[in-house]
């Protein structure tokens, strides 16, 4: 398993809405994540800066990245775009992080 981490950014005033939407994550989106090798997916929030820290373990990063091509992922992005910084294609603005330490 490969560990993948990134940072994303909420627009101010959307912390509760972000949590609400993820608490009700669409079953089709859950299925797509699992089908693309995602496991142990967590998202943490820095409440002072509206910064999100996402962590997911993936079987194969290349396969996981293909989720972006799915209709359900693009629909999810469109749904989330009004409450977080997003690219022109509605994907979240995300900064991939480099792992610098791991303790098994």
Curated annotation (Swiss-Prot):
Pfam annotation, one family: rhaM
Keywords for this protein: Carbohydrate metabolism, Cytoplasm, Isomerase, Rhamnose metabolism
Single GO term (MF): L-rhamnose mutarotase activity
Biological process per Gene Ontology, one example term: rhamnose catabolic process
Active-site residues per Swiss-Prot or TrEMBL entry: 22 (proton donor)
Broad EC category: isomerase
EC number: 5.1.3.32
Localization annotation: Cytoplasm
Catalytically driven reaction(s): alpha-L-rhamnose = beta-L-rhamnose
Cellular component GO terms held in the UniProt record: cytoplasm
Binding sites annotated in the UniProt record for substrate: 18, 41, 76-77
Biochemical pathway: Carbohydrate metabolism; L-rhamnose metabolism
Source organism superkingdom: Bacteria
Function: Involved in the anomeric conversion of L-rhamnose.
Subunit and interaction comment: Homodimer.
Family to which this protein belongs: Belongs to the rhamnose mutarotase family.
The protein's name in its UniProt record: L-rhamnose mutarotase
């Amino acid at each position: 398993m490969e560990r993948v981490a990134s940072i994303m950014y909420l627009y101010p005033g959307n912390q509760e809405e972000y949590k609400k939407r993820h608490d009700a994550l669409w079953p089709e989106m859950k299925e797509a994540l699992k089908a693309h090798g995602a496991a142990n997916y967590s998202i943490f929030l820095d409440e002072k800066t509206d910064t999100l820290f996402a962590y997911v373990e993936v079987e194969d990063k290349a396969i996981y990245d293909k989720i972006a091509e799915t209709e359900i992922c693009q629909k999810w992005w469109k749904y989330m775009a009004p409450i977080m910084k997003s690219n022109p294609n509605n994907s979240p603005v995300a900064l991939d992080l480099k792992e610098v330490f791991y303790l098994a």
